[in-house]
């Protein structure tokens, strides 16, 4: 039996992305997007709500996110839902859902005078950078 874990979201960045690096030097960029949930037609008591998703990118996609994404930009994110687990200094176990993205695309346009040629032509890699075990000097097979 095979299982499937894929999530596609469209939302706006709630703040500028944050960048850090793994111990091996791989760039990691995180950002949060707000996604509106529209009320159902058959449920008049439903109110529009907003969900917030933490997005994580690795490698070249992380460099792209750091360089071109800013607060307020509308983006499409495609990736996998993961559960990040850690323990606090007091020994309390925590779990937090996050989306490990392998595709990030603009869904809006910046005003023409602020868009760089590089930004509009950039092809976002659709590779899986969720593993920190690769080396750029080694072939991928």
From Swiss-Prot:
Residues 116-141 have a biased composition (Acidic residues). Keywords: DNA-binding. Residues 110-141 are annotated as: Disordered. CDD domains: SSB_OBF. One of its GO terms (biological process) is DNA replication. GO terms for molecular function: enzyme activator activity; nucleic acid binding; single-stranded DNA binding. Residues 4-108 form the SSB domain. SUPFAM superfamilies: Nucleic acid-binding proteins. Pfam families: SSB. InterPro entries: NA-bd_OB-fold, Primosome_PriB/ssb, ssDNA-bd. One of its GO terms (cellular component) is nucleoid. NCBIfam families: ssb (TIGR00621). Homotetramer. PANTHER family: SINGLE-STRANDED DNA-BINDING PROTEIN. This is Single-stranded DNA-binding protein. It comes from Thermotoga maritima (strain ATCC 43589 / DSM 3109 / JCM 10099 / NBRC 100826 / MSB8).
């Amino acid at each position: 039996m095979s299982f499937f874990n894929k999530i596609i979201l469209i939302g706006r960045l709630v703040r500028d992305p944050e960048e850090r690096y793994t111990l091996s030097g791989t760039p990691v960029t995180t950002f949060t997007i707000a996604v509106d949930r529209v009320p159902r037609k058959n449920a008049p008591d439903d109110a529009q709500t907003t969900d917030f998703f933490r997005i994580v990118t690795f490698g070249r996609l992380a460099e792209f996110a750091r360089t071109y994404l800013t607060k307020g930009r509308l983006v499409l994110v495609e990736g996998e839902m993961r559960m990040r687990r850690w323990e606090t200094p007091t020994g309390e176990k925590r779990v937090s859902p996050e989306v490990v993205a392998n595709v990030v695309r603009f869904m809006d346009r910046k005003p023409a005078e602020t868009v760089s040629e590089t930004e509009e032509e950039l092809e976002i890699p659709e590779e899986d950078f969720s593993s920190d075990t690769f080396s750029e000097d080694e072939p991928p097979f």
